């Protein structure tokens, strides 16, 4: 049986990268590279966060890793689906693009972002209020 496709949201990448308690739980859920879909908007968000938090060299290494996964560019079909999901679920633009990418590709979304709570096709690993 083939492992399911998963889109890993920026919030989950960050928890995994910093090695938090939540990140350790997530590491068991992280897909192999061939099942890991990476929207280009996630690469943008990750790059911004990484350069700010750890510097360009480590940012380049993580982005290089994401490029070994299945990178999914924003195309018209995903953009229009994102617009629908934005309106329907009141998501921020980047969140709508990430969620639309997962829905368009028939993948599960792995996230720590409570904005996705209750949406179909989402595996939410919510941050404990003590983690904040």
Show where each model-derived region lies.
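Short, well-structured N-terminal submotif of metal-dependent ribonuclease cores
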Residues: 1-38, 50-61, 130-132
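A general structural signal for well-ordered alpha-helical segments in protein cores
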Residues: 23, 43, 59-62, 75, ...
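General small-molecule cofactor/ligand-binding pocket signal
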Residues: 37, 72, 125
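Active-site neighborhoods of divalent-metal-dependent phosphate/nucleic-acid chemistry enzymes
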Residues: 71-112
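A generic structural signal for short hydrophobic patches within well-formed alpha-helices
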Residues: 13-14, 43, 79, 116-117
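Short active-site oxyanion
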Residues: 3, 33-36, 68-70, 104-108
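Acidic, PIN/NYN-like endoribonuclease modules and their adjacent C-terminal/linker elements
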Residues: 1-3, 99, 103-132
